[in-house]
Amino acid sequence: MTKPRSLAGNVGIAVFVIAFFCVVFAFFSASWLVSDSRITGAKFDRLGLWTHCFRSLPDPNDEYIRRFFVGCRWIFDPFTKGYDQIRGYLVPGFLVFTEFFYTLTFLATIFCAMLVLLFFLCFTPDHKRFVQLTLVIGSTLTCAGISAALAVVIFALFGNRGNWMPGHANNFFGWSFGVAIASIFALLISGGLFLVETNIQQKKRKYFKESQTRFEMEQETKA
């Protein structure tokens, strides 16, 4: 008879699904920092990790203000003239670190998605590698949560300072940033639940081995 997964493992799957979608939305969406839409004449609109949107941004490298950037563009856009020349302005050091840590989070989450599918579809507690699988999932998700936390803290400290995006007083953290915060908790909770599942299954296996040993000793005594 196949042993059932514990409640921790089943809840861990559900929380991981939430974490997965939070990470994906935060990674690809462009609303980490947004401008108040009620402000007329604002130069900045919104931005994410990989996309910047402007209403009318003057070229910061042009002292005569002859060129403006309008609309949403990928930060590595190769087609807009002059966009590569302001990349240092668009992607300062703190944003590079934010992108780095949240990219690690994204990759770890994708990796765990494959492992969670194995856990859900193919592995049962009877499988000899079940404990190792849950340990890897739990540890990786916990590390992903820590990496996401680092990304969020860095962006929170430096993302809305007055020396970066124009209209600082009217800018605020958007829904993408909120989703990134939610991803931290979802990742850490799901990682913790998978580690609890690991501990439960280890104890069950230890108890089963001890029971089997006692049974064998009793049989030998009777014989």
Q: What do these predicted regions represent?
A:
Residues 73-81, 104-122:
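Short, charged N-terminal helix-start/capping segments
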Residues 1-48, 52-58, 169, 178, ...:
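Intrinsically disordered terminal tails
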Residues 59-75, 152, 189-201:
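Juxtamembrane/interfacial segments around transmembrane helices
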Residues 1-11, 87-100, 126-136, 169-178:
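Membrane-interfacial loop-to-transmembrane-helix junctions in polytopic alpha-helical membrane proteins
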Residues 83-94, 120-133, 202-221:
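Cytoplasmic juxtamembrane regions at transmembrane-helix boundaries
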Residues 29-100:
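A surface-exposed beta-alpha-beta supersecondary segment
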Residues 26-34, 119, 147-165, 193-197:
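Helix-to-loop junction signature of class
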Residues 12-24, 99-116, 133-158, 177-191:
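Alpha-helical transmembrane segments of multi-pass membrane proteins
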